[in-house]
Swiss-Prot record:
Coiled coil: none annotated. Pfam families: Ala_racemase_C (PF00842), Ala_racemase_N (PF01168). Belongs to the alanine racemase family. Pathway: Amino-acid biosynthesis; D-alanine biosynthesis; D-alanine from L-alanine: step 1/1. The keyword Magnesium does not apply. GO terms for molecular function: alanine racemase activity; pyridoxal phosphate binding. It comes from the Bacteria. The gene is alr. It comes from Pseudomonas entomophila (strain L48). Its cofactor is pyridoxal 5'-phosphate. This is Alanine racemase. Substrate binds at R129, M301.
Length: 357
């Protein structure tokens, strides 16, 4: 059996969820969209179900997967619905739904539903992706109430630059939100992972922890609360070949690495088809047999090479951690010029094994 595996620590997941609650004193929707950022949405939701206030997913397909697994907690559709015909399913399965565009509001007004809906009305406060314009927000709120199709409305927005701790844009977005919602007596939701960790002055009734649930920091710099996160995923494999090379020999496709000295090279059963970033350069950290070393050469589809010169005890079968508790996913992502969100979501072929259930 190929040794590439992703170990999912569900106790760490619970710790990170509790941290979001502790830091905010708010109710928290655990964001499990995109298969829980590659960690397995159903497993993660089941692990959190007894304590989570609810879950958030991107679309109805992801929500129905949770319902089919027996998850009865509230589930919010972050992108809302894509066509009016979905409203019947939303009502049938008791899902919560974001409304971010006036066409969705009109669809609710015009479409019969079996029971009133819980709507999260999203305002565009400056990200300019989706959301009702601030000048239209009060009217949209009143139209939802007047439709007779809605039992509850939560007011929400999304931050564009909360991961930049010195960015004035976040405070500006809060100011836009507060001005536009003035006089509306409804619960609010503003804080995503970086806002939960790094913006304690922002208050909201609901928070939406995403990347922090999985133990990865959303920041490019060290941050005290992010340091309390516990990595949930350990991507691991084993050495499948070892060879000794003299100085001046190439390693891998394109000969992008030339051994500067006699070099002991280990080949790991892990590649970009598994989701490991192909763009990770020589020098990206790896742990072999408990010792930190580095990637060398270009990542292949199914294999990559590591420098074992300073790990003489490593041999065929030695364990390898690509990221996890000893090598942070954020460090690998930074080396590869990307973000931990992406490298987690890219894992498609690697089996997931859970601990801490």
């Amino acid at each position: 059996m190929r040794p590439a595996r992703a170990l999912i620590d569900l106790q760490a997941l619970r710790h990170n969820y509790r941290l979001a609650r502790e830091l905010t004193g708010a109710k928290a929707l655990a964001v499990v969209k995109a298969d829980a950022y590659g960690h397995g949405a159903v497993r993660c939701a089941l692990a959190l179900e007894t304590e989570a206030d609810g879950f958030a997913v991107a679309c109805i397909e992801e929500a129905l997967e949770l319902r089919a697994a027996g998850i009865k907690a509230p589930v919010l559709l972050l992108e809302g619905f894509f066509e009016a015909s979905e409203l019947a399913l939303i009502a049938e399965h008791d899902l919560w739904c974001v409304v971010h565009s006036l066409w969705q509001l009109e669809a609710i007004e015009q479409t019969p539903v079996r029971k009133p809906l819980t709507i999260w009305l999203k305002m565009d406060t400056g990200m300019h992706r989706v959301g009702v314009h601030p000048k239209d927000y009060q009217d949209a709120y009143q139209r939802l109430l007047a439709s007779g199709k809605v039992s509850r409305i939560v007011l929400m927005s999304h931050f564009a630059r909360a991961d930049e701790l010195d960015a004035a844009a976040t405070e500006q977005q809060v100011a836009v939100f507060e001005a536009a919602r003035q006089g509306l007596s409804a619960e609010c939701s503003l804080r995503n992972s970086p806002a939960v960790l790094g913006w304690p002055s922002i208050k909201s009734d609901w928070v939406r922890p995403g990347i922090m649930l999985y133990g990865a920091t959303p920041f490019e710099v060290a941050q005290a609360e992010a340091a309390r996160l516990q990595p949930v995923m350990t991507l691991q494999s084993r050495i499948i070949s070892v060879r000794e090379l003299p100085a001046g020999e190439p390693v891998g496709y394109g000969a992008k690495f030339i051994s500067p000295r006699p070099t002991r090279v280990g080949v790991v059963a892990m590649g970009y088809a598994d989701g490991y970033p192909r763009q990770a350069p020589t020098g990206t950290p790896v742990v072999v047999a408990g010792k930190r070393t580095q990637l060398i050469g270009r990542v292949s589809m199914d294999m990559l090479c590591v420098d074992l010169t300073e790990v003489p005890e490593a041999t065929v079968g030695s364990p390898v951690e690509l990221w996890g508790k000893q090598v942070l996913a954020s460090d690998v992502a930074m080396q590869a010029g990307t973000i931990p969100y992406q490298i987690f979501c890219n894992l498609k072929r690697v089996p997931l094994d859970c601990i801490g259930e």
